[in-house]
Each structure stands twice: as C-alpha cells, then as structure tokens.
Amino acid sequence: MFDQLDIVEERYEQLNELLSDPDVVNDSDKLRKYSKEQADLQKTVDVYRNYKAKKEELADIEEMLSETDDKEEVEMLKEESNGIKAELPNLEEELKILLIPKDPNDDKDVIVEIRAAAGGDEAAIFAGDLMRMYSKYAESQGFKTEIVEASESDHGGYKEISFSVSGNGAYSKLKFENGAHRVQRVPETESGGRIHTSTATVAVLPEVEDVEIEIRNEDLKIDTYRSSGAGGQHVNTTDSAVRITHLPTGVIATSSEKSQIQNREKAMKVLKARLYDMKVQEEQQKYASQRKSAVGTGDRSERIRTYNYPQSRVTDHRIGLTLQKLGQIMEGHLEEIIDALTLSEQTDKLKELNNGEL
C-alpha cells in the first residue's frame, strides 16, 4: 500500500510542476486535465502526509522516552504516544479506501429514466413520486435538473419520463438507483382500503463524451413530429419533437420540448448515453457472472427497494437497510441511503483489493 502512496505523492508533485509550466498554463485543455487530476489526488496526498507526520512524531516520542527517567515526563510522553497509536489505524483504513480505484463515471452528469411497470395507473403515479423525490434530492445537492422527454398518464404521474441531472459527482450519488422500485400503499381510487403493490424501474445513465462512443451519421434515422400530452392532445402546433433511431441497434431517443434544435441536441445526448450504457451493461453482465457485488448486479429488473406507506418504511434489499423515514425520503432526503450504499460498495472493493482481485 505504501509503495502505491509514494507513487501517488510523486505524481502529485509532478502535477504541481506541470501546472506552473507556461506551456501548460497557455493550453486550456492540458490545464483542465492536469488540474482535475491533481484535485483527484489531493485528499489522498493530504491524508498520507498527515499519516507520515504522525509516524515521525511517534518516532520522536519513542526516542525521547528512551532518553528520560523523569516520571512526569514519561507519563506525558506515553499519553501522547498512545493518542497517536490510536489514530494511526484509522488513517490507514482511510488510506486503503482512498486507494480504491474510482469509478471513471462518478464525476459525470446523468440521464435518469423512470418507467411505470406493474400496477397500471398507480405505477404511473409512483413514477411521478420518484421523479419528484430525485428532483428534490438534486436540488439539495446543488445539481440542475431538466426534463428531456415525458409521457404523462391520464390519471397523474408518468408512463415514462427521462431527465438530465447536471453537477459535479451526479453519477456517484445516483448510480445506486438503477433497478426496480416497489411501492405498497392504498391508492386514492381504492374505496375498499386494500393495499396495492406497484413498481417502477429506474435507469441512471452517465452522459458520455464523443470520444467515448462513436456514432456514424449514416447509422441514424431522424424523424420530427408533433408532441402530445396526457390524453393525446397536441402540445405544439409545429413538428418540433424529435425522434432519433440508431439503426444498427434499434435504440431510440426522443425529446419533445418547444425548440426543434434543442430537441435534437437532447435526443442525441440521450442516445449516446443509452448506447454507452448498453456497452457497459454487457461488460457488467460478464463480471456479474463471476462475482455479485454487495450492492447488487445493477440489473434493471433487480428489485432494489420497497416503499411501504402504511408502515412509513423504506427497505433497500441490497444491503438490508430499513428506515422508518418514508416521508422524509420521498421529500428527497436520500443521503442516509446513498451513504450506506457507497460504504457497502467501498467495503466490497476493499475485500477484492485485499484478495488481490483488482
């Protein structure tokens, strides 16, 4: 571990020199690239330097202890020594976590897609509730949300809705939401007071750069049409909505806001994210066949969470976490769940590192 940390610290110093080089300062791409790399290493270097300083301080105390016979001084030095010895294991654990390979998508913006599944109108209403929950959470994190495409249900909510979430670390916070979400509650239209179970699926797709996935113009079919709202009524009087089909895969992306130019840009952004996600899902399925991660396979059909309204309970099935805070969670207070899932993922990766499997 410490050999790795020495390499990280050495690279950090190299980046310091590069960022003061006039050739780099005058090249915006290099400046941005090196600044980001240095920022990514900053926490690891800070903790490692603190760890080394504590080790040196401990060595100095041990040396002083060997040179003194003064009881009062010995007692004071031993107290300092014990305090540092208690700190070191925590710093070592923190360094192990900091050395875990970072998900390359963590800092990216995302496209979130929510689809009503089993449960008819109630599933569509629940899809709308999830959309509201994520929007409130995004707002609390300083992220920006923008609807890309929405198909409203006649009785409220959405048959399906996709929206972008922009902000540093958006994917790292929302990536664990992939999967099937189940709700148990009495629908407003249910006169007998019976509890119904409905589901909605959530897909979180990292937005991708052009360099990450190649799309040829000849592989695209672009159609324009009039967008419609709930009940089928036309929202726009011009053909501003855009549908883009990727012919080799059959993947389709649409956007139906007022501007055709903006719709084309949004639809292309979604198409790229879906094609990239398709590639990632194939790779994950190969990996999942060898080892199932602690936070699930990421399979879209995997039931990950249940929202039980009568008992005000939310259960995340991947890590066995149950919280009696349904009201707060539906208002966007997802921090406790996301932190627990992040910790579970880190623990899982740490086990693999210790077994030499990464």
Swiss-Prot record:
Family statement drawn from the similarity comment of this UniProt entry: Belongs to the prokaryotic/mitochondrial release factor family.
Taxonomic lineage of the native organism: Bacteria, Bacillati, Bacillota, Bacilli, Bacillales
Record keywords, A-Z: Cytoplasm, Methylation, Protein biosynthesis
Coiled coil (UniProt feature): none
Organism listed in the record: Staphylococcus aureus (strain NCTC 8325 / PS 47)
Job description of the protein: Peptide chain release factor 1 directs the termination of translation in response to the peptide chain termination codons UAG and UAA.
Descriptive protein name: Peptide chain release factor 1
Record flagged with keyword Cytoplasm: yes
GO cellular component terms, A-Z: cytoplasm
Gene coding for it: prfA
